[in-house]
UniProtKB/Swiss-Prot annotation:
MF terms (GO), sorted A to Z: unfolded protein binding
This protein's name: Symportin 1
Organism listed in the record: Chaetomium thermophilum (strain DSM 1495 / CBS 144.50 / IMI 039719) (Thermochaetoides thermophila)
Subunit structure: Component of a hexameric 5S RNP precursor complex, composed of 5S RNA, RRS1, RPF2, RPL5, RPL11 and SYO1; this complex acts as a precursor for ribosome assembly.
SS bonds (residue pairs): none
GO biological process: protein import into nucleus; ribosomal large subunit biogenesis
ARM repeat coordinates: 183-216, 420-453
Region span, Disordered: 1-28, 325-385
Amino acid sequence: MGKTRRNRVRNRTDPIAKPVKPPTDPELAKLREDKILPVLKDLKSPDAKSRTTAAGAIANIVQDAKCRKLLLREQVVHIVLTETLTDNNIDSRAAGWEILKVLAQEEEADFCVHLYRLDVLTAIEHAAKAVLETLTTSEPPFSKLLKAQQRLVWDITGSLLVLIGLLALARDEIHEAVATKQTILRLLFRLISADIAPQDIYEEAISCLTTLSEDNLKVGQAITDDQETHVYDVLLKLATGTDPRAVMACGVLHNVFTSLQWMDHSPGKDGACDAILIPTLTRALEHVVPGGAKFNGDARYANITLLALVTLASIGTDFQETLVKGNQGSRESPISAADEEWNGFDDADGDAMDVDQKSSSGEDQEEDYEEIDVKEDDEDDDDDSITSEMQADMERVVGADGTDDGDLEDLPTLRELIQTAVPQLIRLSNLPIDSDESLTIQSHALSALNNISWTISCLEFANGENANIHNAWYPTAKKIWRKTILPILEADSADLKLATQVTSLAWAVARVLHGETPTDGNPHRKFISLYHSSKQQAGGNSNSIEEPEDPFQGLGVKCIGVVGSLAHDPAPIEVNREVGVFLVTLLRQSNNVPPAEIVEALNQLFDIYGDEELACDKEVFWKDGFLKHLEEFLPKMRTLTKGIDKRTQPELRTRADEALLNLGRFVQYKKKHAPK
């Protein structure tokens, strides 16, 4: 009978630590022997002074990439967690937290996951409790401590805050775990509410709370329910100020309002919703002046400006939920699907274009539009003030007796976005690009405009639905087109990232304006040219543009979406013809065109030529023989669709299937309704 094998692990000096092989690189091997091993030996020394000195030394050398990698090989994390953080000497503990902070900052997110699995949250909670007690105790009061002692407390606090923020960002499950730690939340509330922390610690605390409060109902409720420091009231008061802390407070409050669903139609305490934050966020943008990156003489405003732009962009996106919830019960299907550019033909709809149904001139489309009796301005004033032109456009849209922005009284957030934020965003999108900072500001301003524009473009405006929003947005959309989109197009930048941003914005704006988009300078030709030039650049340099994970977010798809929207009735027939030929040509060259672009081209053709009553149907679709090309493309589309893997690209396959189905129906419908 065999003997049970003896467990040799118990005979090791340290069962957790495995023998570490020295690196094969001579330089690293020497560095390990001369610097790393001696300092690690001192870190585990019985002598308290040696341990403290070693911890401080490691906190310094861990910044160096080579030293950091060697320290990680030698199990420095295990030593710090089990020995340094429990040291009686506060200097050692401060150095230990500094080591973990730097490692978390320099390494990938997986390192934070590793720390979490080593139960670092327990150590953080214990340290946070100690800091909280030090700050709140009256014997002795914190203010009476020696400056050196206070500095050590703030050093530990700063390291804890950075670690908490990085851990929360690393993975959703860690985010949720941190949000349940009441001691951590109490420390954050105390640092924000009590005017005791240095500016850098305060900013780190509010940044950390912003991270934790994002999409987290528990944290949102904890903030509003806090009776110890009344942090919610403090944040509200801060948000009305004019200093950088006001913008930081707005970031937290926006997350709170979103998680608690305090919206325009269901505001929270004292009418709290995002509308009260927009004026403060917009004021922060006024510090950015032409000539640049100095931000009116204070470089500190750069980060605050970016935070304000990011928060406005988030408000622009989250406002879509407000529109959905506000329309529930009063309208059916007020929002079109944002991820579908055409919903196909509905078999249940009596107006569906199906040969098996009675024909009519209606169809189920996402991009329906109202026939608006309006003439475009031939000239645009260069005055920075937007108010007068917006009012003039408004009168053209709704008539002299029409309603004005007062119709948005029940949508204060949208009103503030249109009247207060968008003018500043337009201004920032046109800043002279003379530094990396100004380029970053422009990019974030475009992102905010893009989010706001797409949220509104996904509304249903057919048959007078959401007319008040359309009337308020229409002149603003034209202003964005003239003041932001056209200048960037005319600059003809080779920056494909910028081109992608402005094309996405143009698509969102054109979806609302349709064929009434200003045609100054033939923008459809510019976007067609941009489409072709992007293909040439991508073909010549694989690194010229990063392919998005979602194939429908590529520059090519966006260019197709823009030109399709520009061709909608009542666009000039020549514009319609040029766009139609471009789209049909893409289908004929389908072997060299990505499937997502083919799908978008088909959807745009369906939308443009779906109504046989429009002039473009006869003058372009039939005169230019588009039906023949669509019939010839049908078998190619079947082959293309079958070649898309459902497992690896499920959305692309689904939308390709829909486009194929609709193409067959569209061809049959057109054949049945050919002009006589």
